[in-house]
């Protein structure tokens, strides 16, 4: 979802890090989003050698945000996840995950796709990430009961028959 390295991620202390690359000539940069009621001054970003950074403690969920660079609003151009802001522009979107799907083994496979009730059984959307021992995919799931299966190189395979409850 990001062009290059992620510009929003969770650090090892479960703090969400927002990065704005470049703009070193800016004098003030703020982070604004639904997590701070779209405040224009509550979350200042700190200047670094590669741009600007802010750390925010977020609960799992879906978040919208923009940067305010010397008074000018701007979406995160390095984040491909975005939704209309209702004013003919876009908000950048970030999901703080609450679940990590894991599938052990099958390391000989080229692709594993996760499909389930949470994405209308879409067979292409959720590509899992290969690890040394299997496959993983962190996600944000709404509370409720979810059923799912895996697709290994185009072939439907087993899943946890009990599904996931949260």
Model-derived features: positions:
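Eukaryotic non-catalytic protein-interaction modules, chiefly N-terminal intrinsically disordered
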Residues: 1-10
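Aromatic-rich carbohydrate-binding modules that target alpha-glucans
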Residues: 9-60, 72-143, 151-166
């Amino acid at each position: 979802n990001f062009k290059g390295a992620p510009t929003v991620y969770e650090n090892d202390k479960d703090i969400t890090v927002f990065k704005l690359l470049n703009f070193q000539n800016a004098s003030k940069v703020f982070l604004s989003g639904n997590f701070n009621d779209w405040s224009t001054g509550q979350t200042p970003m700190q200047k670094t050698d590669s741009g600007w950074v802010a750390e925010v403690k977020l609960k799992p969920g879906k978040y919208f945000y923009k940067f305010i660079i010397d008074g000018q609003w701007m979406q995160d151009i390095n984040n491909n996840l975005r939704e209309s802001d209702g004013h003919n522009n876009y908000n950048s979107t970030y999901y703080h995950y609450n679940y990590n799907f894991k599938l052990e083994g099958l390391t000989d496979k080229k692709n594993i796709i996760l499909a389930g009730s949470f994405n209308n059984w879409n067979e292409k959307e959720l590509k899992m990430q290969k690890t040394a021992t299997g496959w993983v995919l962190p996600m944000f799931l709404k509370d409720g009961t979810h059923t799912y299966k895996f697709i290994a190189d185009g072939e439907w395979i087993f899943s946890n028959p009990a599904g996931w409850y949260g």
